[in-house]
């Protein structure tokens, strides 16, 4: 099947979507309208590139025709040959780009995310490193123009992060941060270490796509919500009115506690966002486990306990174990300049998928 055979139906469907999205019946159906809007957004880049590619093909044809008709006009012939050379080079570039755009798209790529970071093995040092990761993702979000909102956090006595839950909103957030789930290992000399020995600690990161209510509806009878007084440092109650919310999804036992906001309703809304994402993620993981061959990500094993990256402070080195990438830029990466790592992961993923399709 040539590239036209693959891409023309995509363009035809894109034009059909444009008509459907202006249909009053579709507009009045929120769920259907969102599904079609998302489908249109997911194909827009491919269709735009395909239309540009067709123009390049036309340019090649025009240049070849001009060379034939030059009739001894050396200047015109030279100009046409230059145009032909540039257009053929552009054709190759577009074909490579279109092959990647035709790869099966992760339906979650354009979604916002719920980001969870926890200090794991290593006590206080693990919690401090979890705080470093939080700062890294916050700064990276700034460079991307994303909104980063801490929804719930728990700190320890030395200022480290026991657990933090954040919402990251913006363009294509999940597509870039989905590779961050897993165990992140740090090797450094803790501030409390008097002998100068390097210690190894771990923090875990979980990235889940935000799930809208129209996409995944939780039966209210499966939820239990308890209201209690928010507590501050030392455990003292800080609100005279009970505003904190503890929400439990009874079938799975998944629990969320929220007390960051000053009103019960805002805490309930945030808790609902998190529990919806966690429950949807829980069942998605079960479905993937049942289809093990499809479950394993091309970047790593897909196992969330997998050690994905090591941050070695003495050597200013970051190593991503899934793709064998080592960079002597730890300070740069932790300051939020993550593009080199993320771009390498995306490229590796795309290359593996292309190879799989060509087998």
Swiss-Prot record:
Main location: cytoplasm
Domain of life assignment: Bacteria
Keyword Cytoplasm: yes
One annotated GO molecular function: translation release factor activity, codon specific
Record keywords: Cytoplasm, Methylation, Protein biosynthesis
Subcellular localization: Cytoplasm
Acetylation as UniProt keyword: no
Residues the record lists as N5-methylglutamine modifications: 236
InterPro entries (UniProt xref): PCRF (IPR005139), Pep_chain_release_fac_I (IPR000352), Pep_chain_release_fac_I_sf (IPR045853), Prokaryotic/Mito_RF (IPR050057), RF-1 (IPR004373)
NCBIfam families named among the record's database cross-references: prfA, PRK00591.1
Role summary: Peptide chain release factor 1 directs the termination of translation in response to the peptide chain termination codons UAG and UAA.
Family matches, as PANTHER family: LD18447P
Protein name: Peptide chain release factor 1
């Amino acid at each position: 099947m040539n590239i036209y055979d693959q891409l023309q139906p995509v363009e035809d469907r894109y034009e059909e979507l444009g008509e459907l999205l202006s249909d009053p019946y579709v507009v009045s159906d929120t769920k259907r309208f969102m599904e079609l809007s998302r489908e249109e957004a997911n194909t827009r880049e491919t269709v735009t590139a395909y239309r540009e590619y067709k123009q390049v093909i036309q340019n090649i044809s025009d240049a070849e025709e001009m060379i034939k008709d030059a009739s001894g006009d050396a200047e015109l012939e030279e100009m046409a040959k230059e145009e032909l050379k540039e257009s053929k080079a552009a054709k190759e570039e577009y074909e490579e780009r279109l092959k990647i755009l035709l790869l099966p798209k992760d339906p979650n790529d354009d979604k916002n995310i719920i980001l969870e970071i926890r200090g794991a093995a290593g006590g206080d040092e693990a919690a401090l490193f979890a705080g470093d990761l939080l700062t890294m993702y916050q700064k990276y979000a700034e460079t991307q123009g994303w909104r980063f909102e801490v929804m719930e956090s728990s700190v320890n006595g030395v200022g480290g992060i026991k657990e933090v839950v954040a919402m990251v909103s913006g363009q294509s957030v999940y597509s870039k941060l989905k590779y961050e789930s897993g165990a992140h290992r740090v090797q450094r000399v803790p501030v409390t270490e008097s002998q100068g020995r390097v210690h190894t600690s771990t923090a875990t990161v979980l990235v889940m796509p935000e799930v809208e209510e129209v996409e995944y509806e939780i039966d209210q009878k499966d939820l239990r919500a308890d209201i209690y007084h928010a507590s501050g440092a030392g455990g003292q109650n800080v609100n005279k009115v009970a505003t904190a919310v503890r929400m439990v999804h009874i079938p799975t036992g998944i629990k969320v506690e929220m007390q960051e906001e000053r009103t019960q309703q805002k805490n309930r809304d945030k808790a609902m966002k998190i529990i919806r994402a966690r429950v949807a993620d829980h069942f998605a993981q079960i479905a993937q486990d049942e289809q093990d061959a499809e479950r394993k990500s091309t970047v790593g094993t897909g196992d969330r306990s997998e050690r994905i990256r090591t941050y070695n402070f003495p050597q200013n080195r970051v190593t991503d174990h899934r793709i064998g990438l080592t960079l002597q830029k730890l300070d740069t990466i932790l300051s939020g300049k993550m593009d080199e790592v993320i771009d390498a992961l995306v490229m590796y993923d795309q290359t593996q998928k292309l190879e799989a399709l060509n087998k």
